Amino acid sequence: MRASVTITRDLLLIGGGHAHAIVLKMWGMQPLPGVRLTLVNPDPAAPYTGMLPGLVAGHYQRDALEIDLVRLARFAGARLVLDRVIGLDLARGHAQLNGRPDIAFDLVSIDIGIGSGIAGIDKGKAWPAKPLGAFADAWEAFVLDVVAGTKAPSVAVIGGGLGGVELAMAMAHRLGGACPDRHAIKITLVEAQQDLLATSAPALRKAMRSGLAELGVKVLTGSAVAAIAGPRLYLASGDALEAEFIATVAGARPAAWLGQTGLDLHRGFISVDQTLRSLSHETVFAVGDTAHMQANPRPKAGVFAVRQGPILYHNLRAALSGGRLKPFRPQSDYLKLASLGGQKAVAEKWGLSVSGAGLWRLKDQIDQRFMAMLSALPAMAAPEMTHGLVALEVRALEAAQPLCGGCGSKVGPEALASALADLAPPRRSDVLTGRGDDAAVLAWGTSDRQVFSCDHFRAFSLDPFVMAQITANHALGDIWAMGGEPQAALASIILPPMTKAKQSSTVAEIVAGFEACLRAAGADLVGGHTSLGAELTLGLSVTGLMQGRRPLGLGGARPGDVLVLTKPVGVGTVMAAEMQGLAKGRWVAASLQQMLVSSRQASRLLRDHAHAMTDITGFGLAGHVQGLLSAAQLSATLDLNQIGWTEGAIDLARAGIHSSIFPETSRLANALQASASVRADPRFDLLFDPQTAGGLIAAVPAEALEALSKAFADHGLGLWVIGILANELSHSPTLTVTA
């Protein structure tokens, strides 16, 4: 999170294509100081398209062909923005995004590939092979339906290029192993041209046609698709065919928004020179299928994108530092390896073709080597040790786990309690409660109450807009926990070293993030303070009004109440793993999305029923439940099986990964009642995991559960019944954990 060199330039990578993935890897090995690197991609992972037929055929699991952009971005020190670019304002140097404010850049590179589909055909009726995520999910669901006997094993693949032929054979192979009646399988390959693989060498066409025939794939050439209605595909000839699953690898086309940018285009693709720079705009580079190499036109193939990666890396650095650019010289021909459904492949180069199982093994080795290059990242460098003689304990602290962001960066509960032990109680009559609860309660007018709280922490995400939203959501949690309605907020912003222009654009993103969350909560951002420091740190002071309701808080739980939870637990562990490059990208994306979910509706549903309520933050689930119990003088039992867990958190806890504050929060474990087997359960450790923008815990009467469960379900919200309070008061409340 620290920026040791002042940020002077913004480099924006649009799309997580193969060339950009290579740039990220190389940038992590040798970054350019002073450059803030940003990657924008809709998904946390990008597919390696060369292994797609193997996934469809069942040879690979999905993880095997996903390039984890979250891990690569962390390794490169880049911020990853999970969104879609919809336009470029090249005059201002701004990228326009689908769901957030513009991102400014000094230099931009575009590697977004191509889409597939047929004009006039509803996307919901035919599955494009790209993007991979939706296609893979739909295909796996279809295979399960075939196995269950609820759908017929009939498939149509639209597009007779190399990708379509490979896909048809892969589907035939997969269904052959999944369907008990092989004679029921019907795979049809539909091509508008008069021949398959029209641009391929005759030897390759012959081998692929032989593979199709061997697998029983029916081929229709000269058959343009006119329409799709239900499970029926209508051809321009008037003929129709039935298919329960329709895939399209035809109609490859560039992103429509490129046509609105003013860039020099060739049939919709960005025209670039030999250095991969736009012919019309020197601040724009393009690679992969997005680009048209004006001097050396080549077919759309992944091999060129992979080989462009190192040249692009060099040229981006050169353009940002005043160096000399290198030309990219593509080979005139290349080895084509195509799978034949099963574990066999065909190879073609210079018009010669050969096939067999050995070539599938060769293809697999090449593919696996490429994926290993992007996934086997070097260990992240440890912070530099202090030189010379140091005080006692310094070396041990330097060797400890790096400090987490969010609530993982907070002071531990024991140190905080000790520091506040001598704090005097409020002296003013209008300050009704002070420390000890989620928010202070102040008198407001003659009869109302105002609740007041603040939160700030070091950033765990390099995306200022998302980090600001999460910070605001977290700060508002104290207002929601009291049952209040947010009123106003003041911001505290610490920026790392950067030029004035970068300060302006970064603060604009932060303010937009604060505003997006606060406005949705019904509150106003009314001011704040900024300063420069070592790293990005954000905070908010927030007020809320009770509007005539009694403030909720830690006190008030009653014997026999049940404990309910409104969000899964485990984001602290996932984000700690992300900092170390150990979390899967989809886990990180799920955690970020979880932290962006507001507790507004949950608070409104709970506050009329709850006897006590708090939000889960830095002390973890166990620590905050213990706070409720101590205030009510009641014991309770928690059931690990009833708690919702953040995706990936259990796997990471099992691997021994924890937040940096875990040694402090887990000291409470000694006071809990639990069997040895429960303590050995990785979920037990997650009870002490700090939560940023965590959910609410409420003590509610058992008779309110049915109505609450229905109300939460009606609003699409989760509600977990995680425990029950004892029926009798206790001077030494204990928390018992079961599983």
Where would I find each of the regions flagged by the language model?
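A conserved FAD-binding loop/helix module that cradles the flavin
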Residues: 290-339
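FAD-binding core/adjacent interface of flavoenzyme oxidoreductases
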Residues: 2-9, 77-156, 247
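C-terminal auxiliary extensions adjacent to catalytic cores
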Residues: 342-395
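FAD-binding beta-loop-beta segment adjacent to the flavin cofactor pocket
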Residues: 268-285, 329, 345-346, 351, ...
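Helix-biased detector of long, well-ordered alpha-helical tracts
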Residues: 389-739
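A Rossmann-like FAD-binding core segment of flavoenzymes
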Residues: 80-92, 103, 173-274
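Beta1-alpha1 glycine-rich phosphate/pyrophosphate-binding loop at the start
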Residues: 2-79, 166-200
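FAD-site-proximal beta/loop scaffold in flavoenzymes
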Residues: 124-151, 232, 240-307
